[in-house]
Amino acid sequence: MNILDALDAQSKRTDLPDFRAGDTVKVHARVVEGNRSRVQIFQGVVIRRQGDGLRETFLVRKISFGVGVERTYPINSPAIDRIEVVTRGDVRRAKLYYLRELRGKKAKIKEKREKQPS
């Protein structure tokens, strides 16, 4: 392993949950306003995960007052306080860009059901 890989491994976050495209997540991001900071919660559907290592990002989409809002977050950003997975989505694609054109019930993602141990 070279020096850059070792630095990347040190900077990578391990406290984040496992999530993928289709999951509904709450992103608790620290926002600095002037001399004070607060935590802002952004809840929406993960549209994509992209990249690998320190440069990995994910895109979250929500509808706010009838307008679609999308935010891209770096996974290893220190500005992210924590990520909560609200629901697991059952989708067959890695990138859900088609949700941008859908409205109402058509934009709803089926919830993944956990298998019961027998």
Curated annotation (Swiss-Prot):
Gene Ontology biological-process annotations: translation
One GO CC annotation: cytosolic large ribosomal subunit
The alphabetical list of record keywords is: Ribonucleoprotein, Ribosomal protein
Q: Which GO terms describe its molecular function?
A: structural constituent of ribosome
| InterPro entries noted in UniProt | Ribosomal_bL19 (IPR001857), Ribosomal_bL19_CS (IPR018257), Ribosomal_bL19_sf (IPR038657), Translation_prot_SH3-like_sf (IPR008991)
Among its keywords, does the record have Zinc? Answer: no
Q: Record's superkingdom? A: Bacteria
Matching entries from Pfam families are given as: Ribosomal_L19
Q: What role does this protein play?
A: This protein is located at the 30S-50S ribosomal subunit interface and may play a role in the structure and function of the aminoacyl-tRNA binding site.
Family per UniProt?
Belongs to the bacterial ribosomal protein bL19 family.
What's the protein called, per UniProt? Answer: Large ribosomal subunit protein bL19
Annotated gene: rplS
